Structures are given as C-alpha cells and as structure tokens.
Amino acid sequence: MEDLLVEVRLDNGAYYKGQVTAVADDGIFVDVDGVPESMKYPFVNVRLPPEETVEVAAPIFEEGMEVEVFTRTNDRETCGWWVGIIKMRKAEIYAVAYIGFETSYTEICELGRLRAKNSNPPITAKTFYQFTLPVPEELREEAQKDGIHKEFQRTIDAGVCNYSRDLDALIVISKFEHTQKRASMLKDMHFRNLSQKVMLLKRTEEAARQLETTKLMSRGNYVEEFRVRDDLMGLAIGSHGSNIQAARTVDGVTNIELEEKSCTFKISGETEESVQRARAMLEYAEEFFQVPRELVGKVIGKNGRIIQEIVDKSGVFRIKVSAIAGDDEQDQNIPRELAHVPFVFIGTVESIANAKVLLEYHLSHLKEVEQLRQEKMEIDQQLRAIQESSMGSTQSFPVTRRSERGYSSDIESVRSMRGGGGGQRGRVRGRGGGGPGGGNGLNQRYHNNRRDEDDYNSRGDHQRDQQRGYNDRGGGDNTGSYRGGGGGAGGPGNNRRGGINRRPPRNDQQNGRDYQHHNHTTEEVRETREMSSVERADSNSSYEGSSRRRRRQKNNNGPSNTNGAVANNNNKPQSAQQPQQQQPPAPGNKAALNAGDASKQNSGNANAAGGASKPKDASRNGDKQQAGTQQQQPSQVQQQQAAQQQQPKPRRNKNRSNNHTDQPSGQQQLAENVKKEGLVNGTS
C-alpha cells in the first residue's frame, strides 16, 4: 500500500498525504487525509512523496533556505506541507516565513517539523498502472474476504488488489509495468489455489466450531455414554442420521458424539433429564419374552390383529416370533424354555418395556379365561354324571322339561292322569299294560325309531306289548317317565304319546289291516280289556267320559277294536268327528254284560297287574254294580254269551294263525255289537 502514497495539492496551496484508489485516463482517485471521501484529482496536482533516505547526520538548514513545514492554519484543519523561508536559526529553533500569502506570516518551528523542499514533479498517466482480473463465479463469495489475495498481490508487485462487486473482478493497481504481465501468468494458479484455500477455510471453521462445542461440553455437568449392538446401529442412527439430529434438538443437549468403531454414543447436556431423553431416542436393544406354546395363537390373534395392536401402541420397531423348537431355521442365540415360544422385541428400551407390559397383561387375561373355562367344564361333567345316575334309562333328559303344548293344554293334562298299573318305581296315575313284562321304558315323544304298526295297537294286547316293549297309553317301567303312567315290574315303560318326530297316523286301509292282528287265544283277555275300560271310564273326568263315548259311538258300525276305531276317527276331518246321537240300550244288556264278565275281569286284572298293591276304587265300584245287576240278566243274552264263548275267535293275522281257530264273522259281529252297547251304556 506504500507504493500508492501520493501528495495532493489542495486549493490553499499546501500538499496533503493521500492514497491512490483508482486510476482514470484524465486523473487519479485519491483518498486524502481530512477529506471525507475519495475524489478525483488532476495529474498536475498530484506528486509522489520524496524518497526517504537514511541520513547519518541531521540536515543542515541555513538562513534563506526554502523548506517545507508540516503545519496547519487552525486547529480544525489537517496538517499539510507548507512552503516557507528560514529567516533566523538559533540552535534547533527556526523562524520561518510562509510564502504565497498576501501578508507575511512568520512562525517559530522545531527542527522535526521541517524537511527539504520536495522536488518530485507531478505524476502522469503512466505513473500508475491499473487492470482487472475476472473472478470465477464459484469463488466470488470467497474473493470478497479481506487479505485473501495478499500473497498474490505481493508476488506481482501490486500496490493494491481488491475485489469489486460491481465488476465481479479483481482490481490491481501498481507503479510497475511488469505487474500486469505477472498477474496474467499467475491468475489461473491463483484461482485454483483460492478454491483449495476456501476448502481449508471451511474445515478450519468447522474445527473452530468443534472446539467451541468441546469447550461447552467441558462446561456441561451431565454426560451419558452407552453402547448399541452392531446390527442395531442402523436403527439407532436413523435414515440419513435423522435420529441423531432429532436427539440434538432436545432442549439442554449440548453435544452428541458417536464412535463408529465401538458403536458407542456419548451424550452431553446441561441437565440430567435432557440427557436421558436423548438417550431414550438413540438406545436400541433386543429382548426376549417367553410365551406358552398353547397361547401363541391367541397372542398373535386373527390375522395378527392382537400383536399388531401391541406394536402400534408400544412404539416398538418389530416383534418377531422365533422359530419353534425343532425347526432348521431357529436361531441358536435365542434362549428357549420348555413348552414356550420366544417372542423377540426390537426397538428402543422404552418401547420394549411398553410392549412387555401389554403382552403380560394380555397373557394374564388369557390364562384367567382358560382357568374359568376349565372350571366350567368340570362343573358340566359333574352335572352330567349326576343326571345320568339319577335319571337312569331316561337318557339324561332334563327333569324339568315341560310339555311342548304348554300349560293351557287340558287334553294333555287329562291324558297325563291315565296310565297303567304301577310297578316298583312307576307312577300311580298310570294305567295300561302292567305285569311282569309291560313296556320297554322308552318315551315315544323323544325317540324316532318306533314302528308304525304299533301306533294303533289295542290297549290291552299284553302279549304283544310284552314282546315289543310298548304300552299304548302309559307304558310303564320300574323307573317311569316324566309324563307317562304306570308300567310293570320288568319293562322299561315307554310312553306312546309321541315325540318330536312322531309320524302321522296311517290311512284307513292300514288301520283296517291293523284290526286283524291278534295274539291271544282266548276271549278272556278281550273281556278283561273291555271291563277295564268300563272301570276307567267311571273314574275319568266328564271330558274324558264324553270323549271316550264319542269314540265308542263312531265304532258301532265297524270292527270292534277300540283303539283301531279311535285311530280311524283321528284320520277323519273334524266335522266328521261330531258326537252321534245313540239310542240307550236296555238295562238288561248292560246287566248281562257286567255279570258275564265279572269273573273274567278279576282274573285279567290279576294277570295284568302282576300282584299290584294299589287297586283302584273304580274297580270295587264296578264289582258291586255287576253283582247287583246279575240277577236281572235275561236268559236270551246269557245264551248268546255262552255261544260266543264256545266258538273260537277269528284270526287277526294270517302270519300268527298257529294259536287261533276260525269263527264265523256274523257271530263275531253280533257279539261285539252287544258288548259295545253295554260299554257305552255303562259309561254314560
């Protein structure tokens, strides 16, 4: 910069120090002391300062010599070089009279303020050389820094080398002509070195920041250091270091360092809480949880719904179910327990703890539910065992089962009062085929395998009932049934009142064929059945009596099988089942019937009941009535009764004709009509 020093003469005639800032064709821009801004001055007003020489002795000033005095006219002005003549000299004090003023002005000056008159001529256009060097765009920002071109300026002997934003170039000013030539040779090298210098400067600045951070870290009170497993470093760092950047933004965290070789994080912070928060974001781990094998499916859930919910709520990165023991792909590093499957949790330590809490709670719930289910199964087994032991042959049907017809079924309530004679454990209300072999103990209402040909059997056909184990009305058994009546001592006691799959009654042709099935060889069994019907009719309600009487009246014109007639009536429309008006028979017929069958009834009841201990009051009343009316029986009826007893009965079934004899159909029809009339009169 000293090469660009000049002296500029201002309007007052004095020369002032200045520095060249730019060179123009008709002048030069100089920054003069005492002038606010750089201004352009003509070349004639500018000169170079005198050369400074090393003088061995002080200069000798004599009187009358022209000298230049460094002074000023007032205190507000800047000092400049003024021309004067020495008037008097005394030691080192000189009296100088200034030249160029209208009035003479003399001043006493010291030796240090004096110098010899400057003999340099004014400068010209070739005194200073100025040229520009364009700067690459990528280096313009760095070229503006102060002192960055200092070495380049010294090498080319330039007085000044500055970057101009207006020109985007380096402005070089020098007193030497060779400066421009050197600059042309070195500019490429200078700009290449400048780019390297910029990179080094950036590294220097980064190092300075690290130094500052280190100083701040040294002032920090809390430091946490932890290690992350090698295979989990990617999760800890995050995508493009996102996790580390997020941890650095935590309030109070001053520094986070990572040693990649040892996979160690070092966190420094102002408070312990901030350091712990940053550690929770970076510390990834892997832990195992043993789940019972039988609960693995329930823990995972349908389509993985339960395990996915645990992942979402806990924030864990991944839950992996390890391969089951025995598989080829199982990891040997995973600890295993007997009858357990390890679940592998991968994520931050905090998220793994949350996942364990959720999984433990779900497992405790599953175990509790399984325990309740086992208790319920044990109770069900005990209940089933008690029902089987108490119900016996009822096949564990609930005791409290009600009739399917509901409470309002009067017909069902009336029918439930019927039933055969009681056995050892049968109901007293029952009636029907008692004896040693009556009934098989199955309720037809709950069984599907009953035979259609049994739907229309006679109520007193004991031999066939004993063989097949069925009872028409009550069945009977030593155990009985919920709805059934009586039964014998030996049979299981089936109730013929139908079940869920009860078949519809047969047509008239089938019913007509059923009338002909007979297994008894004597008329005594038939008479016993008819007399039992009379006794029961006396003891039933008015509804039962009228219903039975209508069925007897319907059967007066057909074969004399009581149950068959009832079955035929059931198949007819309801309009055809209206009670028919009957002519009351003569009292003699009733008396003859009761007297002729008294002894047969007693013997039939004895055989049917098998020594039953519960006779009915209706049977005793029937015996008294028969004894009273026996004397009034006409002789004609007795003869017909005797003829009927002497003649054999017709065959009921050709396949069972071994124990039966033929009987004319006319006599059989006559005898049955007489008996029916007596039965109807007896029940009216």
From Swiss-Prot:
Stretches with biased composition (Polar residues): 387-398, 660-671
Pfam families the record matches: FXMRP1_C_core, KH_1, KH_9, Tudor_FRX1
PROSITE patterns named in the record: AGENET_LIKE (PS51641), KH_TYPE_1 (PS50084)
Gene Ontology CC, one term: perikaryon
Annotated organism of origin: Drosophila melanogaster (Fruit fly)
InterPro entries, alphabetized: FMR1 (IPR040148), FMR1-like_C_core (IPR022034), FMRP_KH0 (IPR040472), KH_dom (IPR004087), KH_dom_type_1 (IPR004088), KH_dom_type_1_sf (IPR036612), Tudor_FRM1 (IPR041560)
Low complexity bias spans: 555-581, 588-613, 625-648
UniProt function note: Polyribosome-associated RNA-binding protein that plays a role in neuronal development and synaptic plasticity through the regulation of protein synthesis of mRNAs. Acts as an mRNA regulator by mediating formation of some phase-separated membraneless compartment: undergoes liquid-liquid phase separation upon binding to target mRNAs, leading to assemble mRNAs into cytoplasmic ribonucleoprotein granules that concentrate mRNAs with associated regulatory factors. Mainly acts as an activator of mRNA translation: promotes translation of stored mRNAs in oocytes.
Gene Ontology MF terms in the entry: DEAD/H-box RNA helicase binding; identical protein binding; molecular condensate scaffold activity; mRNA 3'-UTR binding; mRNA binding; mRNA regulatory element binding translation repressor activity; N6-methyladenosine-containing RNA reader activity; RNA binding
Annotated segments matching region RNA-binding RGG-box: 474-489
Gene: Fmr1
Keyword Calcium in annotation: no
Residue ranges constituting the KH domain according to the UniProt record: 221-282, 284-353
Protein name listed in UniProt: Fragile X messenger ribonucleoprotein 1 homolog
Family: Belongs to the FMR1 family.
GO biological process, one term: neuromuscular junction development
